[in-house]
């Protein structure tokens, strides 16, 4: 079982998840799944050069699919915030790359249109795959699942966990409504709220 991540009782059960909250959960899954790697959470403008030629999020800016394959990483989860690095943050979305299934999956719990930044990253991965003889299918969800305001981070975590299990396709995952209450229950399990 994953270590519970209780916040000394200070965090409310429906408070918006921070990047640190998401990172702590995903790093535990990384430790338990040697074929999985997590990147992020990253601001949407991951490839903007900020200083000395460095990008906002170097792992994404310098992403190299071949290096992941060499390290036997076949599943990669990425969480993005839809705000740029110089803003507070507004909404979490996720991308999952399954090299064995040859799929790149984009999940937004609101079912909104994909950002040009994430689309550009997915195209970059697709081109790298083609050079390695891997034809990726890029699929985006269009269905809205979230109707409350605080659970987008939990939806991202849940999406990555479910895709990592590899028991259902992306289409199967997104076809049935995933209610906010399910995310609240998962939050209580992962973060041990009273």
Name the predicted role of every residue range:
Residues 158-194:
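Contiguous terminal or domain-adjacent regions
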Residues 65-168:
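Cysteine protease-like catalytic core of ubiquitin/ubiquitin-like
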Residues 25-29, 121-124, 128, 189, ...:
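Residues that form generic nucleotide/phosphate-binding pockets
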Residues 22, 117-121, 182:
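Alpha-helical structural motif
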Residues 49-52, 117, 174-178:
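Charge-rich, low-complexity amphipathic helices
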Residues 1-93, 99-104:
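Cysteine protease catalytic domains with a Cys-His-Asp triad
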């Amino acid at each position: 079982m994953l270590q519970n991540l209780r916040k000394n009782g200070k965090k409310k059960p429906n408070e918006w998840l921070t990047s640190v909250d998401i990172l702590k959960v995903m790093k535990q899954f990384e430790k338990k799944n040697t074929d999985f790697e997590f990147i992020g959470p990253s601001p949407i403008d991951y490839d903007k050069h900020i200083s000395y030629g460095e990008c906002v999020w170097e792992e994404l800016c310098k992403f190299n699919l071949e290096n992941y394959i060499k390290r036997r990483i076949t599943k990669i989860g990425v969480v993005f915030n839809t705000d740029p690095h110089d803003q507070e943050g507004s909404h979490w979305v996720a991308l999952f790359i399954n090299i064995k299934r040859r799929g790149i999956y984009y999940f937004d719990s609101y079912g909104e249109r994909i950002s040009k930044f994430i689309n550009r990253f997915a195209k970059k991965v697709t081109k790298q795959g083609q050079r390695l003889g891997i034809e990726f299918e890029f699929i985006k969800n269009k269905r809205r699942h979230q109707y409350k305001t605080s659970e987008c981070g939990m939806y991202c975590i849940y999406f990555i966990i479910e895709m990592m299990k590899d028991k259902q396709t992306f289409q199967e995952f997104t076809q049935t409504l995933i209610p906010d209450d399910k995310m609240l229950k998962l939050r209580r399990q992962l973060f041990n709220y009273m």
